[in-house]
Design a protein with these regions (language model features):
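Membrane-proximal alpha-helical signals and transmembrane carboxylates
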Residues: 2-202
Length: 202
């Protein structure tokens, strides 16, 4: 009986270790993830939806001080925002991770027609952080803002973060998080409010 008990215990231990191995193997390495820092939504041609996901390129490049911190972006389009989201995986060479999204940008045309379908998509995603900040890009597309900001050595997410640091002096309104926006849209007695960013020529 004792031998059977030892054998049973060993089998149980092997099964447990096997389960742990599967859990560990299920985790993606950091270099296998496309960690999104900025999500951008726009209206594309013929009424299609466009999504741009941007991550921070941490490559040091050459020269130390001249290290690049630009963003890497992937663009996807679809007949609806849900189609565009599904199509993202076909353009990514890594697994998308939205758990570190800091900023969500909307092009002006999207804002005028309504951002609810986009907020619905975001709120259904299990990884999105509800403290991510929302902005509308006035007079332009969100994708265009990201592309312009990433032509320099600074990452667009870092630029947006610097704007927030000085929001009391440079802005006429405060920040709105994803959680606050969802509460605003859910409450009939509250006015809809999302701050905007207006690109200026340099």
């Amino acid at each position: 009986m004792r031998k059977y008990a030892i054998l049973t215990a060993l089998l149980a231990l092997m099964a447990a270790l096997s389960g742990c191995t599967q859990i560990i193997m299920g985790r993606a390495e950091i270099d296998k993830l496309f960690i999104v820092r900025v999500f951008s939504f726009d209206e594309a041609e013929k009424g299609k939806a466009r999504i741009t996901v941007t991550t921070k390129d941490l490559s040091t490049g050459e020269g130390g001080e001249g290290a690049t911190q630009k963003g890497e972006s992937v663009v996807s389009e679809g007949d609806t925002v849900f189609d565009a989201a599904r199509n993202l995986s076909t353009y990514l060479d890594r697994k998308l991770n939205a758990g570190h999204t800091e900023f969500i940008l909307f092009g002006e045309s999207i804002a005028r027609k309504g951002v609810l379908p986009y907020l619905d998509l975001i709120s259904r995603h299990p990884e999105f952080r509800y403290n991510a900040k929302l902005y509308i890009v006035k007079g332009d597309t969100a994708n265009s803002l990201v592309e312009k900001a990433n032509t320099s050595k600074y990452f667009v997410g870092d630029r947006l973060a610097r704007i927030e640091e000085h929001i009391g002096r440079t802005s006429i309104s405060g920040m709105v998080t994803l959680n606050e926006a969802l509460l605003i849209f859910d409450e009939r007695n509250l006015d809809t409010f999302i701050p905007y960013i207006e690109p200026v020529p340099t």
